[in-house]
Amino acid sequence: MPSSIFGKEKKDSLILPRIYAYSKYHQPYSDTLVDNVYLKLRFNVERRNPTLWIIPSMYSLAKGERQYLRETYNKIEYTNIHDYDIIGQVKAGTIRHNRNAMPTLMDLITPKIYDEALYDGYVLSPFNRANKRLYKYRQTTNAAEGTTRIDFKPKLYNTQLLNGYAIVETETGRILKSVLNGEFDMINFRTELNYSNKGGWFILPWRSSTAATFNFVGNRISTNILSVHHCRSELPDSIQWAEGKATMDTLRPVPLTVEEEELYEKTEDYFPAPPSPEDSVAKKPNILKKIFWDTIGETLVTPIRAESEQAYFRLSPIVDPLAIRYSDSRGFSYKMKLRFQYTFSKHRYLTLNPYFGYNFKIRQFFFDAPLRMIYNPKRNGYAELTFGNGNRISNSTVAEMIKEEFGDTLDFTNMEMNKFKNAYIRAYNNIMVFDWLDIESGLVFHRRHAVNEEMMRRYHMPIVYTSFAPMIGIKILPWEKGPLFTTTWERGFKGIASSNISYERWETDAQWKIRIPGLRLLNLRAGYGTYSHREQNYFVDFDNFQETNLPDGWDDDWTGDFQLLNGSEFNRSNYYIRANASYESPLVFATWLPYVGKYIEKERFYLNSVLLERSRPYYEFGYGFTNRYISVAAFASFKCNHFQRVGFKFDFEIFRRW
């Protein structure tokens, strides 16, 4: 007779604890596992409109045929069950130029069913002990087969949860088969996974099939995905992204259907029709159209990628809504990123990861270009050279000196007399002396140019200030996953490289990210900075305490950053003492709201405080949430226990993982 468990399991049932413990005590072999995986995706464009053109990776499906096929043969290298690399070796298909459409579908074929999150930090697994409180379970035992079927569903509907069932080996708790129904990044899916009984692979799937549907602004695309693991054909590591149906025919572990063969047969990329002479003139307009839409158009809305055995290059799309940022104090900005890596050997490679963008509030172009040579990855040894034009910096002393000489009646409001553009060069080396200690040393050069040159000349003030300084930094990580302590010293000297500023600065900082079961995260940060020597009150420029005019997203700088504090406040203080804390968790308060709560993926609470020379104490309280579309946060600031103002910040999250 079937037995049931709702919400909390009965004391006489051990099936759920066996599942929780199975992956812990049955890890794969310690040696690196290598698997060959065949993947087949079939797309059916049911409805589409012009908005499909601007969705990353969907450009190739925005026109032409409505059914497409894509096949890949891949090598997966598992370092452990949580960490693996997918290396594409052969690809074929009917999508133009063999483009990869909807890359987020790749996450669906290898869910980490025993982890807290199934898909790289998203969707809470029902088979992890930390998430048990979020699901209801029903158990049905088949004594004859020695298996148990466990049906699960969420206690509260949310895109971070799913429903389905699993067939489990009753005696051991090993999952033999699972069916998952849910939503992930605007994709509704149903995935069926069959798990291997082969030694060393028993907690990994050997075959999976997924039916997925993408709906967005009237566009509807359905996809069927088949993945087959443990394929016998072995390819050399030197083969990466070879193209051709003929090659795929020799590797494919399952035959194509009649409909799939027909898709290949009518694809011009594989069976081009020779043009007749009389058609040549008539096709010229189509060639121009192809150049415009396929070359220029695709470059605008999709990332530009290039990859070889030694080099990798990626530029974010030129037209990308994800690049738009807004904060109440910094205004709107648009930001792009470039990633480049060149590998000389396994232990030596060069990276260039610049970002550049435009801040509309102050109408200025910004960039930061770090060029890094990694020469000893094992000891975190690298040399880095960074060019940038940074954020504008205030110099309140300039206005004070002018008023002292020419009279207090002068009004410099809205004249940007104290604003300077900041260009810089940093050159330094980092090395891990011990497993818990890093030391970096180098040189820093700043050139600060007045924004209002005319007014500076009128009052006989310098237009350009330069500084040259050696620096030393120490990073201490006492234990793995513990707090990171840093101390930096920087000393500016006059007369070197036209430097006209002398100073000495010390800063200490401590940061700790404490991960709590259930995808919860507690961020703690504290820091102190001061100038031990300074001839004039020029350019208070702390490394760990400054505003940025090109802010990044939810996962980058929303924690540990002051959102409403005016830059002029900390640009005229000789010291700062700061403390920041934030708590992040899925399924807190907003999840319970009707209609919209099911789309809230994570929530975050902020508390920021700082003591400054002329502004103490200063507090910020904040609340934010993120989902598949957008991240939003609201902040309230208080100065000397008096309310100041409220501000907001948002980023687009839509298609961030595409």
Stretches with model-predicted labels:
Residues 334-340, 369-373, 425-431, 472-476, ...:
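Residues on the lipid-exposed face of transmembrane beta-strands in outer-membrane beta-barrel proteins
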Residues 382-400, 410-417, 486-589:
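C-terminal outer-membrane beta-barrel translocator/porin domains of Gram-negative envelope proteins
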Residues 192, 219-220, 366-369, 396-402, ...:
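Outer-membrane beta-barrel translocator domains and adjoining extracellular loop/strand segments
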Residues 328-330, 340, 412-446, 479, ...:
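Outer-membrane beta-barrel transmembrane strands
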Residues 152, 175-182, 210, 313-326, ...:
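Transmembrane beta-strand segments that form the barrel wall of outer-membrane beta-barrel proteins
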Residues 2-147, 155, 159-161, 217, ...:
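Structured extracytoplasmic
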Residues 344-351, 378-383, 435-441, 448-451, ...:
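Repeated loop/turn-to-beta-strand initiation elements of outer-membrane beta-barrel proteins
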Residues 187, 330-334, 363-367, 421-425, ...:
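Residues that define the transmembrane beta-barrel architecture of outer-membrane proteins
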